[in-house]
């Protein structure tokens, strides 16, 4: 079986290409960086195409383009969980093995592979961290929590402050979309469970996994996680945190550079996410990779762009301008970076502890099944055990097919 790859005659063609990614929250910093490329290579200009801010809709747009053989998209940004699906369907081409940059974190590089071949190059990795309202904790004279029990106690203490009795404790992204999959996976993994174990076996109905789901269900029931969070995606949760509706927030690092400037550094801080029952928090690995579409006409320019977009210079730029987590380990310890972005060591520790979402060619079906089963449990319409058992049956069917 011959998969499409970047070898042979078509590698010589150079001309204009497009770079396709989700919505840019950085206030035009992506375009600014592309302007540098366009000045340097006027015959191989890159135009930016921004898709939705939502992962599920981005994926749909990319699939529609691939299925209609559209040549509009050349280099595309893929959530790392989509790589297998796009490679298996031959919507993206194999990348030459010598593309791997020196110093890239190995586990991050591997997110671009499918069946032992490389189909995508990471340009940002990602793991969540805990944002906390420093101002509220100081008013209540409370330490930064290290455990789930501490989070509960800190929330109770802050609720005793004047006009604070209704503040939410711990926020996240619990709307019915990809964020829900990331958030529930963290509770399940932290409690010692797994949706699918390393051998590919469905284990979402194990006692440990059910405990993880139960912990989230209980947090909604007790209003530790505010009910409003059932509608929250990334930006909603950031708004909730900024406007004082929630004390702690699990979110990705992009929020630090792009949005919290208005809140001011004296009002918020970043810390590791809390352990649950003595088990260290297991963050969900995020990140985006760039891949070259099979329909791309100018594959030589596309590959040259991918190498430039994932170079150390570009990664440093995207770290400074968008607080994107870089793919190179050394950028997390570089003195001037840590001075500017003091959360980097916390983020690196989160990345090192992070676990991927289930690997599946039919990832779209897997994540939809997770959302369909878990959401009603969080709403209190069904219990954790029933949700887990229903999900296990559904996942077994998807994986078998």
Task: Give residue ranges: language-model regions.
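Single conserved hydrophobic/aromatic residue that forms the stacking wall/gate
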Residues: 1-8, 13
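Short, well-ordered beta-strand elements
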Residues: 10, 14-24, 44-51, 74-75, ...
